[in-house]
Amino acid sequence: MASASSVSLMLLVAAAMASAASAQLSATFYDTSCPNALSTIKSAVTAAVNSEPRMGASLVRLHFHDCFVQGCDASVLLSGQEQNAGPNAGSLRGFNVVDNIKTQVEAICSQTVSCADILAVAARDSVVALGGPSWTVLLGRRDSTTANESQANTDLPAPSSSLAELIGNFSRKGLDVTDMVALSGAHTIGQAQCQNFRDRLYNETNIDSSFATALKANCPRPTGSGDSNLAPLDTTTPNAFDSAYYTNLLSNKGLLHSDQVLFNGGSTDNTVRNFSSNTAAFNSAFTVAMVKMGNISPLTGTQGQIRLNCSKVN
């Protein structure tokens, strides 16, 4: 058995390696090799979101679900595997938009810009397109040659998660409680399927009664009936990236159980109150958290590859 000191040393080395990998990311990574990459991505994302506002949330979710499973390496884009995991099957979308972006970028810079970086930039540009804050995306990630379905099933937070489970999920990825509450604010856009909030509608008491009644019309009690019917995560301004998500929580109008637990007499109540009344504070915390999330275990240097097609390895 390893001694305590050797275990500590191994942890320090692992932390140093992770830090070094993140340090290799740079905002200017493509300035010389593909100077028009970012503007090309932005134009494609803006067009996609203008055509279908919901796509903005879908692209943000793709980046989140990528980073939480073996790091921000575009593993979520590989056909099958992670896409078949419980949290992803039948709900992940936006692959066609990513493929379109990749095709456009390949046309100007062959095998230069990674799919992982496209996801990171597309998430930022989606938030901006819906009126949210911007931030500097660090670049230089490379694409994985593997995906991990089992890790997707264990590491992605579930809509039924308790506050303690959410804190643990995010902590294991190097994200603190404020990061977790801020990143949850991405639910100010997007929609969820009835099967993910049915139990909350019919079995929980910390939900506004009129809010629940309105939702029940499109989400019947019997399991299997209307499972894929959609409802906006933020019923107030569903297509605007703002702080209304937190204001809704103050009124017990969180759609998912994992939303409302952020304001239910627990340790995150004050953060929710602050973000609800101070949009600037939310925007600041959100951008910081997105940069931190984008730095989770990236492949850099000669690790991985630059995929020619985001859905399969070269």
Swiss-Prot record:
Alphabetized UniProt keyword annotations: Calcium, Disulfide bond, Glycoprotein, Heme, Hydrogen peroxide, Iron, Metal-binding, Oxidoreductase, Peroxidase, Pyrrolidone carboxylic acid, Secreted, Signal
GO BP terms, alphabetized: hydrogen peroxide catabolic process; response to oxidative stress
Cellular location(s): Secreted
Chain sites annotated for binding substrate: P157
Binding residue positions for Ca(2+) 1: D66, V69, G71, D73, S75
N-terminal signal peptide: 1-23
Binding site for Ca(2+) 2: T188, D234, T237, D242
Catalytic activity, EC: 1.11.1.7
Active site: H65 (proton acceptor)
MF GO annotations: heme binding; lactoperoxidase activity; metal ion binding
One GO location term (cellular component): extracellular region
Source domain of life: Eukaryota
Sites of Pyrrolidone carboxylic acid modification: Q24
Binding site for heme b: H187
Similarity comment text for this entry: Belongs to the peroxidase family. Classical plant (class III) peroxidase subfamily.
Protein name, UniProt field: Peroxidase 2
Organism: Oryza sativa subsp. indica (Rice)
